[in-house]
Amino acid sequence: CVVERVSGQSFDAFLQARILGPLRMTDTRFFLTPDLRERLAAVYAANDRGGYARADEGSRGQGSYVDGPRASFSGGAGLLSTASDYARFLQMLLNGGTLDGARILAPATVALMTQNHLGTLYNSNGATGFGLGFEVLLDPGRAGQYGSVGRFGWGGAYATNYWVDPAQDLVAVFMIQLMPAGGLDL
């Protein structure tokens, strides 16, 4: 991991020191200790009756990957959080890289991250583009989405989704907990 080599820290320690700690994201981590496991939201999955039921602990449920400790951490998956913690991260982005006096990113870095870098490679009709980690809304009408030009966000496992709309001074976090998430129109 580049972050580990440059910083001399494990990836989880780097995130804690540079992002999670300064933003006071106290409920965000790569694994849960036994005392926190009971706070984990249940995952639901489609059943054979056309409805939804609580998923088992296997591949569709939360499974053992949430239990720790572990020594390997991914920069692209596996971080557990709460809606309120993740909203703090998004608010930092909305604020141009700062929250409650903690500067995490330079305003120019946030601006670079949230602009379309792929032209029409991501979406051939030009309705949405992709920045450095985010889908960027370029034409709400053509995209069939609510929001302002420049709104950015993405989704994750279990139908989690978030977006930041700078023009409306708004952040949104959805923690649906459904697997697979197909068929949901957020």
Task: Describe each model-derived feature in a short phrase.
Residues G156-Y158:
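Short, small/polar residue-rich loop motifs at catalytic or cofactor-binding pockets
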Residues Y162-W163, D169-L178:
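Short, well-ordered beta-strand elements
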